[in-house]
């Protein structure tokens, strides 16, 4: 799985930070081999086709959030249905993806990667407004309180979390109590702050074909 994540970054030509701390270390496969995996073919001149470019953008954002094709397509299609009803469909799509519980756990620093965050959510490590939630796709809402279950805080995975969070900066729409290991949603995700690694308009074009 980890090897495949490294190949994903190399294939898409950019670091997507899919493996947490390793991505920031010299061991990062993209740093060592910043080219696509497999036999290296002679590159042809010219730009990639519109279809290939939009496909690459779609793959990049999908992999960044760690979603399956079915999951990602559903988010895009549902967002496209809101065309003309919302001010910015790109912001709408990113907002929904950012508000997934697994992504929020990652953004808060409670997990080192979205993959790890998804596993922790699935194993019911967290409470939303005092109630256990184990659905990674759960959409957090404004004023939701997100906390690690008290008896889970002693687990090895959280042993150094309080110290690690001292250096953590969270998105402006989240408020983090670094001592209590508790957070609250205080706003909405901001597209400019998220800085997605893909051109959203091309993704909409891909699924509109």
Language model segments and positions:
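Short, well-ordered loop/turn sites that connect or cap secondary structure elements
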Residues: 120-121, 140
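Short, intrinsically disordered, mixed-charge
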Residues: 107, 122-123
């Amino acid at each position: 799985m980890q090897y495949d994540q490294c190949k994903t970054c190399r294939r898409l030509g950019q670091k997507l930070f899919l493996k947490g701390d390793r991505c920031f270390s010299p061991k990062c496969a993209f740093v060592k081999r910043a080219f696509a995996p497999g036999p290296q073919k002679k590159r042809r001149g010219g730009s990639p086709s519109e279809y290939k470019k939009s496909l690459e953008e779609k793959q990049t954002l999908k992999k960044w959030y760690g979603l399956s094709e079915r999951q990602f397509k559903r988010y895009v299609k549902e967002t496209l249905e809101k065309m003309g009803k919302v001010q910015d469909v790109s912001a709408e799509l990113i907002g929904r993806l950012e508000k997934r519980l697994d992504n929020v756990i990652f953004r808060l620093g409670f997990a080192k990667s979205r993959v790890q965050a998804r596993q922790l959510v699935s194993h019911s490590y967290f409470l939303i407004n005092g109630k256990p939630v184990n659905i990674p796709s759960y959409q957090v809402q404004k004023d939701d309180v997100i906390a690690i279950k008290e008896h889970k805080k002693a687990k090895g995975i959280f042993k150094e979390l309080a110290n690690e969070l001292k250096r953590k900066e969270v998105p402006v729409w989240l408020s983090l109590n670094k001592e209590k290991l508790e957070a609250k949603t205080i706003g909405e995700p901001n597209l400019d702050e998220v800085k997605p690694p893909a051109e959203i308009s091309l993704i909409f074009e891909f699924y509109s074909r």
